[in-house]
Amino acid sequence: SQIGHVSADSINPSSANENKYFFADLSKLDDLNKMFEELIAEGNSVGAKLGVCVENCPVGLGEPVFDKLNADLAKAIMSINAVKSVSIGNAENILNLKGSEIRDEIRSDGFASNNAGGILGGISNGDNIDLDFLIKPTSSIKKKGKTVDKDGNEVDIEVTGRHDPCVGIRAVPIAEAMVNLVIMDHLLRNRAQCGEVDQQLPFTK
């Protein structure tokens, strides 16, 4: 949803497969092209904010304490190179809202909101699992920086070779694969442990 200073005004997941940046807002492609041209000329890099949404996830996946679904998802995403933070649900506004505002009330036709991001108490609640994560700008860039040599003397360093101005672009299919693996693991575990348990929701989505 964001690369460097360019953020999406609207999110259309299908648009992500229609451009080389995996960006979900096609109206921002010109801005991205300009930014990357400047980054390449400057020998610099930027970070990115990415999102993964799991739709139609069964209710009941996960554990209440050990092997929480959100903990396993966070571990999988944090295992991707350059990832520095992971959030699930409406994490950005969690400090600005009261409990009465952020709770996901249940109606006869389903949840009224999805601030929890599809996971409550470490267990999937049947709603979409919304996961966001941030990737840092890579430090392997052509622009000169400071370091020390083996004797502790301050020297300049310049990385040569081919380096991406944003490694976040390459992380999109990796994140999808990581999330799929975690969901599949929990599906198999749930089938083994709770195969005969009625897990139907009391409402239709």
Where do the protein language model's features map onto the residues?
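Beta-strand segments within the central parallel beta-sheet cores of soluble alpha/beta enzyme folds
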Residues: S1-G4, G51, I88-A91, V197-P202
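Glycine-rich, mobile lid/loop segments that gate access to catalytic sites or pores
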Residues: S1-V65
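Glycine-rich and small/hydrophobic secondary-structure elements
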Residues: N17-F23, I129, M178, I183
